[in-house]
């Protein structure tokens, strides 16, 4: 059974709810085993992630509008520290952001910042707890990212 790891942080429960539903969907529809790592449970510990993973990050920013102020991440920095440690960023297939669209420019801004900072793609986004459509859409995106990564690992150089 193929495996994918989801590395995330959940503070209010929205992201945890999404990850649980996404994990069930991946297991039921793609026969994937999903390993979940909730950074909140680690209490600032880091360790090397040996397998490919997808990061999922809610948006928590200081006040402002996300354009000329309010771009500084708060509360979720342990996820960034975890990704930065032990070369974990190199095994990250990409990031999925969550947020509240009422915050306009700040919506998923932290995930966009992580994508730029670490050089991996922003795979998608969902609002609040996410909808069933978000689950199926992002599961497909994860499967495609995992498949691309697996293809790159198995390619061999032609004989010289």
Curated annotation (Swiss-Prot):
In the record, biological process GO terms are: protein modification process
InterPro entries referenced in this protein's UniProt entry, alphabetically: Flavoprotein-like_sf (IPR029039), RNR_NrdI (IPR004465)
Q: Which GO terms describe its molecular function?
A: FMN binding
Taxonomy, superkingdom: Bacteria
Query: Which Pfam families does the UniProt record give?
Result: Flavodoxin_NdrI
Protein family per UniProt: Belongs to the NrdI family.
**Name this protein carries in UniProt:** Putative NrdI-like protein
Which species is this record about?
Answer: Streptococcus pyogenes serotype M3 (strain ATCC BAA-595 / MGAS315)
